[in-house]
Amino acid sequence: MKHDFNHKAETFDSPKNIFLANLVCQAVEKQIDLLSDKEILDFGGGTGLLTLPLAKQAKSVTLVDISEKMLEQARLKAEQQDIKNIQFLEQDLLEKPLEKEFDLIVVCRVLHHMPDLDAARSLFHQHLKEDGQLLLADFTKTEANHHGFELPELENK
C-alpha cells in the first residue's frame, strides 16, 4: 500500500480529491466547537488536503502517514502557505503508536484500506483524550462499490 501511495503522491490533489476534502473540512467545522483549542491527529492524511485547512484554525495538527512521498507533498504545501503548527510523521501507528492523545482524530478515506477494523478502533481510542472526538469519513458499500462500510459496521464500534 505504501508503494501505491508513493506513486500517486504528485497527482493525488485532483479536483475530485480536493472537493471531497473540502466537504470533510466543512463537516469538521460544523460539528467541532472551538477548533482553536484542539490538538488534531490527521490519520493517513496524505498530502495534507485536510491537515492544512484544519491547521489554520487549530492549536496544532499531527499528520501521520506511511507514505513519505505524500508527506513530502504536504510539507511543501505547508511551507508555501507558511503554516508552522503541523508535525509530519511517517509512521504506521498500528506498529508504533504515539505517546500522545488528541482532542480530535480525523480519518478520511483511510479506514477501508485497513485490514483489521477492530485494531483500528482500538488505535483511535488509544490516541483520543477522554472527551476527544473521532470523525470518520469513508465510503459506504453499494452494489457497484465494495470498498467501504455499511453504517451498522461502524455505529457500534
Model-identified regions with their sequence ranges:
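Class I SAM-dependent methyltransferase SAM/SAH-binding core
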Residues: 41-95
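Short glycine-centered segments of the SAM/dcSAM-binding site in methyltransferase folds
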Residues: 39, 131-133
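Short catalytic micro-motifs in class I SAM-dependent methyltransferases
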Residues: 109-110
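A conserved beta-strand element that flanks and buttresses the S-adenosyl-L-methionine
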Residues: 106
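C-terminal alpha-helical "lid/dimerization" subdomain adjacent to the S-adenosyl-L-methionine
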Residues: 13-19, 133-157
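A short glycine-rich, Lys/Arg-flanked "PGG" loop and its adjoining helix->strand segment in the class I
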Residues: 118-130
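Short N-terminal helix/helix-N-cap motif within the alpha/beta-hydrolase-1
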Residues: 69, 98, 115-119, 144
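Conserved class I S-adenosyl-L-methionine
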Residues: 1-35, 73, 143
